[in-house]
């Protein structure tokens, strides 16, 4: 299946799993914002340290604005394959199209590592 138009780079499975792990750790020891509206606000305010976007969002327009907004605000972002998995990592019983890590807590080093690897992928 072709990737949606808002997916600007390929994320290795291992890195996507690290991103989900970072969301879980930040949920427990830091602060996250769940859902596209909260994520968008966190990016616009410059609060987000890392934005995680699901690749299976339909319609695409729900999250299509996030990659250019993150680039404008110089906030790293990464894709994960499943909105269901992203929702679960964020502690929700429903799917989440996107999540923003505001304070990574104990996931700080992991978030920094992911941000560095994402910069490499975007080149």
UniProtKB/Swiss-Prot annotation:
Disulfide bonds: none annotated. GO terms for cellular component: cytoplasm; ribonucleoprotein complex; ribosome. Keywords: Cytoplasm, Ribonucleoprotein, Ribosomal protein, RNA-binding, rRNA-binding, tRNA processing. One of its GO terms (biological process) is tRNA 5'-leader removal. SUPFAM superfamilies: L30e-like (SSF55315). Its main location: cytoplasm. It is found in: Cytoplasm. It holds the Pfam family Ribosomal_L7Ae. PROSITE patterns: RIBOSOMAL_L7AE. Gene3D superfamilies: 3.30.1330.30. The keyword rRNA-binding applies. The keyword Nucleotide-binding does not apply. It comes from the Archaea. GO terms for molecular function: ribonuclease P activity; rRNA binding; structural constituent of ribosome. HAMAP family: Ribosomal_eL8. Part of the 50S ribosomal subunit. Probably part of the RNase P complex. Belongs to the eukaryotic ribosomal protein eL8 family. Multifunctional RNA-binding protein that recognizes the K-turn motif in ribosomal RNA, the RNA component of RNase P, box H/ACA, box C/D and box C'/D' sRNAs. This is Large ribosomal subunit protein eL8. It comes from Thermococcus gammatolerans (strain DSM 15229 / JCM 11827 / EJ3). The gene is rpl7ae.
